[in-house]
């Protein structure tokens, strides 16, 4: 599956998304853009199954993490145009 995972700079470094991911796609890396000093990173997107648990776990109102499903998945779900 080819999904892309985008981490936005609104990430507060809380680690909720990392803990929610059942496949360890995400990890925290050093970053000086928030108080926590870390930001989520997605080094293993090839393992992402598109469950979007990371999005659900994100406590920010603007979803600092988004999973964009690949064309095969959206087609099989009847979401393709």
UniProtKB/Swiss-Prot annotation:
[4Fe-4S] cluster 1 binds at residues 11, 14, 17, 58. Binds 2 [4Fe-4S] clusters. Cluster 2 is most probably the spectroscopically characterized electron acceptor FA and cluster 1 is most probably FB. One of its GO terms (biological process) is photosynthetic electron transport in photosystem I. Its main location: membrane. One of its GO terms (cellular component) is photosystem I. The keyword Cell division does not apply. PROSITE patterns: 4FE4S_FER_1, 4FE4S_FER_2. Keywords: 4Fe-4S, Cell inner membrane, Cell membrane, Electron transport, Iron, Iron-sulfur, Membrane, Metal-binding, Oxidoreductase, Photosynthesis, Photosystem I, Repeat, Transport. It is a peripheral membrane protein. It catalyses: reduced [plastocyanin] + hnu + oxidized [2Fe-2S]-[ferredoxin] = oxidized [plastocyanin] + reduced [2Fe-2S]-[ferredoxin]. It is found in: Cell inner membrane. Apoprotein for the two 4Fe-4S centers FA and FB of photosystem I (PSI); essential for photochemical activity. FB is the terminal electron acceptor of PSI, donating electrons to ferredoxin. The C-terminus interacts with PsaA/B/D and helps assemble the protein into the PSI complex. Required for binding of PsaD and PsaE to PSI. PSI is a plastocyanin/cytochrome c6-ferredoxin oxidoreductase, converting photonic excitation into a charge separation, which transfers an electron from the donor P700 chlorophyll pair to the spectroscopically characterized acceptors A0, A1, FX, FA and FB in turn. NCBIfam families: PS_I_psaC (TIGR03048). HAMAP family: PSI_PsaC (MF_01303). PANTHER family: PHOTOSYSTEM I IRON-SULFUR CENTER, PHOTOSYSTEM I IRON-SULFUR CENTER-RELATED. This is Photosystem I iron-sulfur center. It comes from Gloeobacter violaceus (strain ATCC 29082 / PCC 7421).
């Amino acid at each position: 599956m080819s999904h892309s995972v985008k981490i936005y700079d609104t990430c507060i470094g809380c680690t909720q998304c990392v803990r929610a991911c059942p496949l360890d796609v995400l990890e925290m890396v050093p970053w000086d853009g928030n108080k926590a000093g870390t930001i989520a990173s997605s080094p293993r997107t090839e393992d992402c199954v598109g469950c979007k648990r990371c999005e659900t776990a994100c406590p920010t109102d603007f979803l600092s993490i988004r999973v964009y499903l690949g064309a095969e998945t959206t087609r099989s779900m009847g979401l393709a145009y």
